[in-house]
Amino acid sequence: MQPDNRKTILCYGDSNTYGYDPQDGLRYAEDIRWPGVLRQVLGNGYRIIEEGCNGRTCAHTPEDEEWKDGRPYLKACLNSHKPIDAVVLMLGSNDLKRQFAAEPETLAAGIGWMMSTIAEFLQLKQGSVPYILVVSPPRIGEGITSSPFADSFEADAAPRSQRLASLYEKTAFDYAQETMNPCGFLDAASLIEPSQIDSLHLMPDAHQVLGTAIAQTLRAFL
């Protein structure tokens, strides 16, 4: 049997990584959601692990749905898929729900905690630190208060989501400066918009753009 020399990329995110379809509430086909696009663009030399969960958070524990907290599951996920060459983190939108009343700075701190946890855990378990690509999520649209998710979000979720990019970029920069570990940053909101259907989830064309951009960023490093 030939050894598997492919680079392993773990995509850790929420419903927009899962591939939630705002048109029917189901899941996009593998070739439509952005990790699938990433797989197509990068080609055979890469193994793409899709770890998207609807409602996943980066800094809070959802009431009655603690399993959606992305922090406790992170180490088990990493251990299941190691060795890992790169991790793509795109989280934060669900932390802006009304039940948390969170400031964007809290979300950036959650992302920073995840970056440190990934680096320290995989250094211990596989003897190397993966490249971490922090992707600030697409903004939440102004129409969120009249969308199917209006009960979950306040009107100020939209402007708060617009503050994430600069905070996440600083978090990634600080991590790189402090640890000298490899990492990158991508602002999804500069490339794509959420659907007009629910002001939160992505349409197929946005998945195509995002997956291609992430592939280009990863290819430059890996």
Give the role of each language-model region:
Residues 1-53, 59-64, 76-81, 87, ...:
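Serine-esterase "nucleophile elbow" of acetyl-processing enzymes
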Residues 20-22, 58-62, 104-108, 151-152:
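N-terminal start-of-chain detector that recognizes signal peptides
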